Regions:
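A residue-level marker of the well-folded mature domains of exported/periplasmic proteins
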Residues: 1-188
Length: 188
């Protein structure tokens, strides 16, 4: 198809910035960016612009002047969070004791998905048993859920801000023989 693609994967903002700087030095034509964090991208985007490299954001927004990138193809993270909370409310549970597994703090996805749950906790009586970052990581999510299980704290909902963290949560539930799903001991 005439295109050559290079790829760098990291969930850490500093590593992403380093990779982006290398792509700029390599003289790529386009830089597609799904940033782990919303901050810290101004100098990279200016360098890309100065080098004539078009930047396209996808999956997540960043805190930068819109003139520094060509396009942004992103989800409405706040709406995603509200949709998840609305679904939880539709389950009509007698109580909501929630383990909240957050993504990378400060990312657009984390902020949007957390905001809706925080509002529900403040206005609808949702009890946040714990609210911790698992940084989009299944293993960290499993450790957090296992810690709550081991503590004996009562919970019946796990609100995970991405699929990998939900998988980690389910692994902890399975290990403890706790049923999960709609109509089970824990809704994930």
């Amino acid at each position: 198809n005439g295109y050559e693609a290079s790829f760098a994967y990291s969930l850490k903002n500093d590593e992403q910035i380093t990779a982006a700087q290398k792509f700029i030095q390599d003289g790529v034509d386009y830089l597609l960016l799904s940033a782990a964090d919303t901050a810290g991208w101004d100098s990279v985007l200016k360098d890309a612009q100065d080098a004539g490299i078009r930047v396209i954001l996808f999956d997540r927004t960043i805190d930068a002047d819109e003139s520094l990138y060509e396009a942004s193809i992103v989800s409405d993270m706040a709406k995603e969070g509200q949709t998840a909370v609305d679904w939880l409310k539709s389950q009509n549970l007698s109580e909501y004791n929630i383990i909240h597994l957050q993504g990378v703090m400060g990312s657009a996805a984390q902020q949007g998905r957390t905001g809706a749950l925080d509002d529900a906790a403040a206005n609808d009586g949702f009890n946040l048993v714990t609210q911790q970052t698992a940084e989009w990581n299944a293993e960290k999510a499993q450790q957090i859920v296992q810690s709550v299980i081991d503590s004996g704290e009562k919970f019946n909902v796990i609100y995970a801000e991405n699929d990998d963290m939900a998988k980690g949560a389910v692994a902890a539930l399975d290990k403890a023989n706790i049923s999960h799903g709609v109509g089970k001991d824990v809704v994930v």
